[in-house]
Amino acid sequence: FLPMTQTIKRLLNEEYLGNPYHLNFRYNANYGRSPEYSWRFDQKRAGSGSLGDIGSHFIYLSVWFFGAVTHVSAELCTFIERPDLDPTGQPYVRADDFSIILLTFSNGAKGVVQATTVAHEPTPWGQTHYFDLHGSGGTLRGWTDWEQTYKLLGAKAEEKQFQEIEIPELIQEGQQLGDIQQMYKETFRKRGQMTGEFIEAVASGKTCSPTFEDGAEIQRILDAALLSSQEGRKVEINKIN
């Protein structure tokens, strides 16, 4: 997990928000703006487009922050006209390049996750991320453009303005947030917090997070979102096998 999301999780564990009300996460990317064929938007090859490719990350964070999801409503859209045939000359089903998902959590809180691959994001990585979390005790707000901004703000219910929240050195582990792209590379490539951590857990017989069970639960939410969009209705997670 990146330093910002680790810090948000710590603050939630310390009940910074009090009773959680709702969250709004936006994942803006631009890699889907090109009209050429791409396997990422081929339903058979990718499984889903923006929903599974990038929306899944923020859906997982939503569950990590606010707990289990009970119901899902979603709308998946395709804005970019792409070729009717894949490179082999076969027709294919075009996957979504934009998705918006409404989550209902078991504690009564709500969440909105928006994932788009067709946003114009004039930054080196072509992405921006936004996090808003609200509760009885206050608000947390974070965002990054993966170039110059990597910021987390907070305001308790009795405060009149936001304060920048420092990301502790314990979480940074020596990473320099001033160089945001280097921080990302160190987190996921040098420190082994993705594949390396998983391999170490298998070799040592220990448990790592996220688990396969976590992944299966997120897949159920994705399946519920696809069904909701197809049938135009709210879907209960327990009805998804």
Report the location of each language-model feature:
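C-terminal glycine/acidic-rich active-site capping loop/insertion
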Residues: D84-D86, Y92, I100, T104-F105, ...
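Glycine-rich beta-alpha junction loops
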Residues: F1, R26-Y31, L76-E81, N107-A109, ...
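Terminal low-complexity tails and localization/encapsulation signals of metabolic enzymes
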Residues: R233-N241
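A general structural signal for well-ordered alpha-helical segments in protein cores
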Residues: M4-T5, F58-I59, R191, T195-G196, ...
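Predominantly a Rossmann-like dinucleotide-binding segment in NAD(P)-dependent oxidoreductases
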Residues: F1-V93, G232
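C-terminal hydrophobic helical "lid"/dimerization subdomain
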Residues: G215-S229
